């Protein structure tokens, strides 16, 4: 999992990217291309 300052640009890189909030943190998850998994931090 990568840690990024801005997830908005990362979200646009693949069609299946989803922005989710869990426990106060923001994540990008992708069930098709798992290499796009990231956390904002």
UniProtKB/Swiss-Prot annotation:
A cellular component term, taken from the record's GO annotations: ribosome
SUPFAM superfamilies on file: Ribosomal protein L36
InterPro entries: Ribosomal_bL36, Ribosomal_bL36_sp, Ribosomal_L36_bact
Keyword flag Ribosomal protein: yes
Pfam families the UniProt entry points to: Ribosomal_L36
GO molecular function, one term: structural constituent of ribosome
A single BP term in Gene Ontology: translation
Alphabetical list of PROSITE patterns matching this protein: RIBOSOMAL_L36 (PS00828)
Keyword annotations of the record: Ribonucleoprotein, Ribosomal protein
Homology family: Belongs to the bacterial ribosomal protein bL36 family.
Protein name: Large ribosomal subunit protein bL36
Originating organism: Bradyrhizobium sp. (strain ORS 278)
Organism classification: Bacteria, Pseudomonadati, Pseudomonadota, Alphaproteobacteria, Hyphomicrobiales
Gene: rpmJ
């Amino acid at each position: 999992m990568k840690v990024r300052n801005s997830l908005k640009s990362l979200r646009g890189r693949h069609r299946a990217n989803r922005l989710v909030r869990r426990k106060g943190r923001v994540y990008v998850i992708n069930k098709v291309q798992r290499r796009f998994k990231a956390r904002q931090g």
